[in-house]
Structure formats: structure tokens, C-alpha cells
A protein has these predicted regions:
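Catalytic domains that recognize anionic headgroups
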Residues: 1-345
Length: 345
């Protein structure tokens, strides 16, 4: 965001919400911009997923550790005290680039990048994903890359549903028998299926993370202004997590063979709170610094600490899948619409 963009949005906020609320929102947005500059050009941190041990890595997009912990009573493989991993990114594009490419590293650390250290692991990795930023990955560096969003996108849900991602992951596991399998679901990331009517996801194709033009932008601005509560948005966020566990994770665990399956995320989600927030159970205290959603390169702990829950999986053979993915070509305009619908534009 440029200074002019910030000034324009500030005027809109003050006009819509008044000097006090609008001014506070603009100050928070300015701080987020400062944190972005720090994360891009100075202080940042995290650990590559290829540094950790796993056979199947399940990526639940935007899933916080405390959100996953709320599922502990419903699924026996999810503990009350969720272990964590420090992600390389605070948004998907940063996570994809830093884990799978050399593109996002400055020259002083280029000798530590993924293609230097993890080329062998990547060559034995199948990546089945519904995240559009997989386009930044060199397909030849992987054993197999399946961009499910290209043919599995659902216009009614404004996202790629979890069941088709599971079907494609099971097909990849059975066909290629990869040493490593990454399965990247878009849920619990917005659009939140329980809030589509309220914010008009069914009427407007685009949404975003900051501002007030598209449905999710409207949601975050209303949260910033106190029109909608954190509890309401959190409830919708939790409902999306239940959706991906029921339709995605559960059938996956019953239809692949893996000694170590890890449930994790690319980054977290923040709701603009300033005080110290305690995760469920024995998790650490952390701040959100007045930041909303998941802007890239913002090195705050609440965005960078993600779940790292280990379990196992056994292929029952119950799920019947097609080996070859459907053929589909996505135009640039369709791709832009989908990026907007997921809050990236």
C-alpha cells in the first residue's frame, strides 16, 4: 500500500465511521504497513517445512493453533494443547515462495534457500493444492504438482471445496507413492460459508483483506469499527475449519498410508486485538498489534506460529478416485476473479 492509498482509505474510513473510529482504523493500517516494511527489509524469521519430519503435510490455510485446539473434543487426534511450528510466511504467497522457491530471499542468505538445501526432498514431493500461489513453483522441481483450483473451483462456494482436494490427494498418493505428500486446503480461509449472505459473496466476485470494497474487506472494516464482533467472525472461521476437517481431513486420513501425518498451516489469522491474547491450553501469550486478516511479510507471532499436530493414516481403499485430473484451462481474468474471491487482490 502506498502513502496515497493509505490517505485515500483514511478519508473513506473517517467519512463512514467518524473521526474517532475511522482515525483509529487508519492508525492501525499505518502500523501494519510499518510492520510490512520491517518484515520485507529487516527482521523476519521462520523454519522451512522441509526442515521438519513428516510423510504427509496437511496445510489448513490460515488455521491458528488456538482455533484447531477448539476441535480437540471432537477429533481424538487433535490435542487440547496444540504444538506449533514457526512459519516462514504471514501470508500464502510468502509461504509458498520461501518454502518452495528462491524468489523471496535476499542475496545474503541465498545459499540457505530451498533449492540449495531441499532439492532432493522436493524431487520426491507431490504437492496437491487449492492455493493459487502454487503458480510460483517450478513444476519440474517436484515429483508431482496438482493445482486443483484450476478445475475444482466452485462458483457457489467462491473457493475450492475440500472434498475434491482430498480426492486428488488420494489419487496422487496411490498413483505416485511419493515419499512426501503436501495437501493444501483453502479452508478455514475466507470466504466463510456461514457469512456469505451477510456480506454478499454471492453478489460480488471479489473480496480482500484490508479496506472496504469487497465482501471480506467490508467484514474486516465492520470488525474494525465494532459493527460485527470478533466472536461472530471467529464463529464463522471455526465453521470453515469444521468443514475442511469433515469433508477433507477425515476422508484423507482413511484413504492414504502414512506413518506421520502433520496438520499445520501456512500462516495464521488476526482480528485487530491489541492486548495479550492467550491461546487455548498452555499456548504462549501473543499480540495482534491492531492488524487484521493476514497481510504478507508482517512478522508478528500470531501470524507466524501455526499448528504442528502429528497423527497417522491408513488407506482403507474406501474412497474411489480417478487417477488423471480433469483437463481445464483458466483464463487470466478468471484467475484474477478467484484471487479476489479469496482476498488476495
Amino acid at each position: 500500500m502506498t502513502l496515497q492509498d493509505w490517505m485515500d482509505e483514511s478519508r473513506e474510513r473517517v467519512t463512514e465511521h467518524g473521526v474517532l473510529t475511522g482515525g483509529r482504523g487508519s492508525a492501525e493500517a499505518l502500523l501494519t504497513g510499518v510492520l510490512d516494511r520491517v518484515g520485507r527489509n529487516g527482521y523476519n524469521y521462520g523454519t522451512s517445512v522441509f526442515e521438519r519430519e513428516w510423510d504427509v503435510l496437511v496445510v489448513l490455510d490460515t488455521c491458528r493453533p488456538d482455533l484447531l485446539a477448539e476441535m480437540a473434543g471432537e477429533y481424538d487426534y487433535i490435542p487440547q494443547d496444540v504444538p506449533t511450528h514457526t512459519s516462514l510466511g504471514s501470508a500464502s504467497i510468502e509461504w509458498v515462495k520461501k518454502n518452495f522457491t528462491d524468489d523471496d530471499y535476499p542475496e545474503p542468505v541465498i545459499d540457505r534457500t530451498v533449492n540449495d538445501n531441499y532439492a532432493e526432498k522436493m524431487a520426491n514431493t507431490a504437492y496437491v493444492t487449492s492455493n493459487l500461489f502454487a503458480e510460483h513453483i517450478d513444476e519440474d522441481a517436484l515429483l508431482y504438482l496438482d493445482e486443483v483450483h484450476e478445475y475444482g473451483w466452485n462458483d457457489d462456494d467462491y473457493t475450492t471445496p475440500p472434498d475434491i482436494v482430498t480426492e486428488r490427494a488420494v489419487a496422487a498418493a496411490r498413483e505416485y507413492d511419493p515419499e512426501y505428500l503436501v495437501v493444501h486446503y483453502m479452508q478455514p480461509h475466507a470466504p466463510y460459508r456461514s457469512m456469505t449472505d451477510r456480506y454478499g459473496w454471492d453478489e460480488k466476485p471479489g473480496i480482500g483483506n484490508q479496506g472496504a470494497t469487497h465482501p471480506a474487506r467490508e467484514m474486516w472494516e465492520e470488525l474494525r469499527a465494532g459493527v460485527v464482533s470478533v466472536e461472530e467472525v471467529w464463529g464463522a472461521y471455526r465453521d470453515n475449519l469444521r468443514w475442511v476437517i469433515e469433508d477433507g481431513v477425515e476422508p484423507l486420513l482413511n484413504n492414504v498410508d502414512a506413518e506421520t501425518v502433520v496438520l499445520s498451516s501456512d500462516h495464521g489469522e488476526v482480528f485487530g486485538r491489541w492486548g495479550l491474547q492467550k491461546w487455548t491450553g498452555n499456548g504462549p501469550m501473543s499480540r495482534e498489534w491492531g492488524t487484521y486478516a493476514h497481510p504478507p511479510y508482517v512478522p508478528i507471532r500470531t501470524l507466524k506460529e501455526v499448528p504442528w499436530v502429528e497423527t497417522s493414516a491408513t488407506d482403507s481403499g474406501e474412497l474411489e478416485v480417478e487417477t488423471e485430473p480433469p483437463k481445464s484451462e483458466v483464463s487470466e481474468s478468471e484467475r484474477q476473479d478467484r484471487l479476489e474471491a479469496l482476498g488476495y487482490v
